[in-house]
Amino acid sequence: MILDTSAVIAILADEAEGHHFREVISSADRVRISAAGYLEAAIVLDNRSAGPGLSPDLDLFVSWARASIEPISSAQARIARRAYREYGRGSGHPARLNFGDCFSYALSKDTGEPLLFKGEDFSRTDLVPAI
């Protein structure tokens, strides 16, 4: 299963879906997050408060989830580029994927693994959702 930043933030910020997402992650055989998604999550968490915010919790979460931080391959970079052209904010498509979303999309597409995410953006693409 691939983690999108939105799912990570929902868990670490104690949002309503966070508990359910934790259950889904704990039952997954394999959990991965794109290196771009990992950085995006750290930036979002740091920007939510002065100082380090919740980003120190990110590494604890990654460890708990047994998530591997996946490097971006050239194939994934090309998939992300196509995803932005088709589903990105500038494309006019209702999914309106951002930069980080495109790398979550690419990792999910490249591996064939479902994506765990919060919101409606990815449900408007051709990806298989984890829930």
Language model: regions and residue ranges:
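Active-site neighborhoods of divalent-metal-dependent phosphate/nucleic-acid chemistry enzymes
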Residues: 68-114
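Acidic, PIN/NYN-like endoribonuclease modules and their adjacent C-terminal/linker elements
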Residues: 105-131
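Anion (oxyanion) recognition and catalysis
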Residues: 25, 63, 109
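Short loop->beta-strand "edge-of-pocket" segments that line small-molecule binding or catalytic clefts
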Residues: 29-32, 65-70
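Short, well-structured N-terminal submotif of metal-dependent ribonuclease cores
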Residues: 1-33, 46-60
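A generic structural signal for short hydrophobic patches within well-formed alpha-helices
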Residues: 8-9, 38, 122-123
